[in-house]
Every structure is written in C-alpha cells, then in structure tokens.
Design a protein with these regions (language model features):
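Mechanotransmission and gating elements of multispan inner-membrane complexes involved in transport
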Residues: 94, 204, 208-215, 219-323
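A short amphipathic helical element positioned immediately N-terminal to and/or at the very start
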Residues: 3-12
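Short, strongly hydrophobic transmembrane alpha-helices
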Residues: 17-41
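Transmembrane alpha-helical interface segments in multi-pass membrane proteins
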Residues: 333-340, 346, 350-400, 422, ...
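Hydrophobic, regular-secondary-structure patches
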Residues: 36-149, 268, 294, 302
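Hydrophobic secondary-structure segments that place a key small or acidic residue at a functional site
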Residues: 128-129, 133-145, 153-254
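Internal alpha-helical transmembrane segments of multipass membrane proteins
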Residues: 23-25, 323-344
Length: 453
C-alpha cells in the first residue's frame, strides 16, 4: 500500500488547519534562514574582501583593526597620517631619487634605498590618502597603481573595469591631475556619470566643499567589494586641494622640483608637504611578508597589519559568540515550530478516530496507521521548510540593494550560509519526533469503540 497519497489527502482534507500549521512552520524557518544567511554572507564578504591582491596594510601606529576597517572597508576614521618619507622607505635608491627630482625635497632621501625595500622582492606599493567625502562616500586619493595591480572576485583574479568611461591617468593632457573614477554605488546614489564634475567635502560628509573639482572620467563595474562605495581620485590632485598640504618645518631642507621651462602645469606638493593615510603592500615573494611585517613593527610610529588576520580576530571575538546566540535562536525557533506541528496533528486526532478505526477494520495494521500520521508530519515539515527557505531568500533579494549599499556585499537568491543546509533536515527530524505522540495515539485507537460512534 502506498501511504504517501493517503497522507497527502489527509493533509489536503484539513486544508485550513494544514495551511496554518505549515505557514507557522514556514515563518519560523524563514526567520532562522534569514538570520543565518545574513550572518554567513556578511562573514564571508568580510573575509573575502580582506584580500583583494595585497597582504599588508601599513599605517600609523595604533589599532590594526581600525587601520584595516578604514583602509580596506572605508568604515572607520583614519588613525592619523604617515609622512610621505615613510612611503618612500619601500623603494629603491633610484626610485627615491626620482621622487626627490619630481616633487622636490631633501636630496639626502635619494642617496639610499628605503629600509623596507629589500623585503619587497619585486612586489607593489600603493598609497592611499583619505579624509574627504563626496556625499556619504569616501574619497580615496591614490595612484594608477591601484587599478593596475589590485584584483577582485572570488579568486582575486579579476581586474577593475569600467562600465562607462575609463580609469584616470597620472597626468591627462586636458584634465591634468584632477580626474576621478566612481564606484558603481556612488554613481547610482549620487546620480552623476562621465563628463560631470564632483567637488569633495573636507573631513566630513557635511563639511565645506573644495573649490577645486575633479572631472569624472569613469564609472567602475560592480565588484561586490567596498570599492563600489568609494570615489577614486588622482593622488596628486588630492594633494592640491585646500587644506591638504602639511606645513613645512622651518629646519627642513627642500630642494625645488626639476621642471621643464615650458611646463605650465600646477606645482606639485614637495615631499615634506605630503602625507599618506595608509599603504597597501604585496610582496613579490609572500615568504617575505611576515619578515616585512616584523621589521615595520620594530619602528616607532608605524605599523603593518595583515587584513585577513585582523578580520579573523574580529570574527572570533565578536561574531563567534554571536554565532552561538544564533544557534540558540535556531534551536528554540525549530523547537517551537515542532511543537506547533505536534499540537495541530494531536488536536485533529479526535476528529480522525473514526477514520482510523475504519482503516483498521479494512485491514490496515497499527504500524500502517502510525506511518500515515508520521508522513503527515513529514509533509508539513518539508513543505513548510521549503516555503520558509524561499520566503527568506526572496526577502534577501528584495533587501539586496540596501545590503549592498551599506556593506558592499552582493546578495543573490541562492546566497547561503554553511549552516543553512543543515536546517531543513533538522526541522524535518524535529517534526517527525513531534509526530510520534499523535502517531502513538492513532496506534492505540480502539477499533470497536470508535466504529460504534
């Protein structure tokens, strides 16, 4: 005898009761799935975005986590700034001498290699200058090396590309050093695009706007990273904005930059006037990364943080205990849902005793009747679980734009957490256990007594 159609007909016969029980279970599952999915997506995104092609972030001495959140995720305020001379410590003697010639500064800086240069092994160094905003979005002053060297995507192998326009140039014939590239979310939120001019505000989203604007020359394709929420401008243009030049000490030795006679471009800041907020580092040989980090930590006023390590510590310290709380919520919610299944089926047993007695009189065994009741529990759990999963993920899709805008995380219908796939079997198992009490009641149904009713 095929018991599944019988259990399904019983489920459909009591349509209202079955619907309410299934809906209650579905809403419970939807709540749990939503919490687990958001937790899993955010955790995965934080860890994934901690590695976008570099392995160290260098900045002023202080909290490594704050440095990571500020430089990688654009979520925290900068600690302080580093002198441009600290940035030069990663370069060879020839490169340092060229910087002195190009910008102007103490000639002694160009007579030696930087103290960290030997640890680079042919890697790359990318400066970041932060502090300005465009609306609620961070303005990031950097060089063309940012887009040339960094990658994104699940395998960190996808270069930055433009949905519209192009990446900024070091010195454009028409725009000079005042070019900007917008993250995808910035362009959507601020309603600007290629050909427009954007004027950053100094130090605060509500601060005073700079008189000098940047020509928008490109809009990045969405990357699913915090870079979607940033505005990237030429570092040299960033330095030339009002209030960005550091006062030169009276005892500083500054030789002027070497300029062509017919060069009518703006005079760039000298080395003592320059500062960087953070430096992104990738060693050519990753074996040197721990050595470089240790070497930097030996110096005063500067630190090197490994973004992945900092984020993992954050997850262990905050998200770890949170996951235990989420597990407790999951267990309680699933238990309540199972109790709902038990109550619904058990309350229907009085109305079904005659039906059960008829089945027994027609030759059905006690085990057969018991199995039908358990199958009803299984149907309610399976249907409710699947509907709840679908409701939760549909909600995530609806809220996807808000989540991406706030966190830079792209959410799809099938974005799931590692614990989520264990939820449905767990709910089904609990519902089967809950079905044993009404099934036992059906097992003990007296045939003669209920047929005479």
């Amino acid at each position: 005898m095929n018991l599944v159609p019988i259990a399904w007909r019983n489920f459909c016969y009591r349509a209202l009761s079955s619907f309410l029980t299934t809906l209650s279970l579905a809403l419970g599952v939807a709540l749990v799935v939503s919490v687990l999915a958001v937790y899993g997506i955010i955790r995965e995104a934080f860890v994934r975005n901690a590695s976008v092609g570099y392995n160290l972030v260098v900045g002023p001495e202080g909290s490594g986590l704050q440095l990571t959140l500020n430089s990688v995720y654009y979520l925290s305020q900068p600690i302080e700034n580093l002198a441009f001379a600290d940035y030069m410590e990663f370069f060879s003697q020839e490169e340092r001498a060229e910087m002195v010639r190009q910008y102007g500064g103490d000639p002694e800086l160009g007579t030696r290699s930087g103290r960290y240069h030997d640890y680079m092994a042919g890697g790359f160094v990318i400066p970041l200058a932060l502090g300005d905003y465009y609306g609620q979005h961070r303005v990031v002053g950097t060089t063309t090396a940012f887009f040339e060297n960094l990658r994104h995507g699940p395998d960190v192998d996808q270069p930055f590309t433009c949905r519209e326009g192009r990446l900024f140039e070091a010195d454009h014939p028409e725009n000079g050093v005042f070019e900007a590239v917008l993250g995808a979310r910035v362009a959507a939120n601020m309603k600007i695009g290629v050909g427009d001019t954007m004027n950053p505000t100094h130090g605060d989203p509500e601060g005073k706007g700079h008189g000098q604007g940047f020509h928008v020359v490109g809009v990045l394709d969405p990357t699913g990273t915090p870079n979607d929420r940033a505005v990237f401008v030429n570092l040299e243009g960033f330095y030339l904005l009002e209030g960005h030049a550091k006062p030169i000490p009276e005892d500083a030795i500054v030789e002027p930059a070497v300029r062509e006679a017919d060069d009518d471009s703006p005079t760039l800041l000298t080395i003592p006037e320059r500062e960087v907020t953070a430096i992104l580092i990738r060693n050519g040989n990753l074996m040197y990364a721990p050595l470089l980090q240790s070497r930097i930590q030996e110096d005063v006023g500067i630190q090197a943080a490994a973004p992945i390590g900092e984020i993992n510590r954050l997850m262990d310290a905050i998200v770890g205990p949170l996951s235990v709380a989420l597990l407790a919520i999951t267990l309680i919610t699933c238990f309540v849902a199972a109790v709902g299944v038990l109550v619904a089926i058990y309350n229907s047993m009085n109305d079904r005793r005659r039906d059960i007695a008829v089945m027994r009189a027609l030759g059905a065994r006690r085990g057969t009747v018991t199995s039908i009741i358990l199958l009803e529990s299984l149907i309610i759990a399976t249907v409710g679980g699947l509907i709840g999963w679908a409701i939760a993920h549909a909600g995530l899709v609806v809220a996807g734009g808000f989540i991406e805008e706030r966190t830079g995380v792209q959410v799809g219908f099938f974005s799931t957490s590692q614990y989520e796939w264990l939820l449905l079997p767990f709910v089904v198992g609990l519902s089967l256990l809950a079905g044993f009490l009404p099934a036992y009641s059906a097992y003990r149904t007296d045939v003669s007594q209920n047929l005479s009713v």
